[in-house]
């Protein structure tokens, strides 16, 4: 089970949002590279970066911070990045810079042709982030519910060659109320590609519960507010996940 620390970038700093609201942000670190080093030293095997300004602007906005993180990581573990990725040129620049996986969210739903082109050009490097509430896909920084069923959308993306799906229950994200494990497992069972859980991770109990259903197709979990607030010790959680897998 991959435990993936999240580094959300806003104005060059590491922050956490509550339910995707840019006005409800808590700054957890001035220097994102130092934050990246912390998780690397704690045993992280992948990092999850989000360009929050980019997500709202529709184009990259935190390039300096992203490059500083990549320099710190220096290729030792994969780094996945989402937020503001709307064209093939941006994907190419990020991959050339050292990003292992690009995460396409809103653009995948609003512009399916772009996602197909991305999978064709950068196969193996494309992850789709599907945000949902009550089983319906949300877009545009969670501000709009589309009415589209998350299972049917994910299945279509799987057929196009997406590497994996990050599934976020937006009713729980940043709330420390616990991962929606039933919904995550239901999605994973309907797909052949792996699912990464996200949204609401509260503590060790969630890690243990996810490990029990790992074989259903759940590759990992995004660790956000809980590892910054102290509700979850990242190194201890990764050790526990490894122990349960042994």
Swiss-Prot record:
Domain of life: Bacteria
Keyword Cytoplasm: yes
Catalytic activity: 1-(5-phospho-beta-D-ribosyl)-5-[(5-phospho-beta-D-ribosylamino)methylideneamino]imidazole-4-carboxamide = 5-[(5-phospho-1-deoxy-D-ribulos-1-ylimino)methylamino]-1-(5-phospho-beta-D-ribosyl)imidazole-4-carboxamide
Cited Gene3D superfamilies: Aldolase class I
Signal peptide: none
Example GO biological process: L-histidine biosynthetic process
Keywords: Amino-acid biosynthesis, Cytoplasm, Histidine biosynthesis, Isomerase
Compartments where found: Cytoplasm
Family: Belongs to the HisA/HisF family.
HAMAP family reported for this sequence: HisA
Name this protein carries in UniProt: 1-(5-phosphoribosyl)-5-[(5-phosphoribosylamino)methylideneamino] imidazole-4-carboxamide isomerase
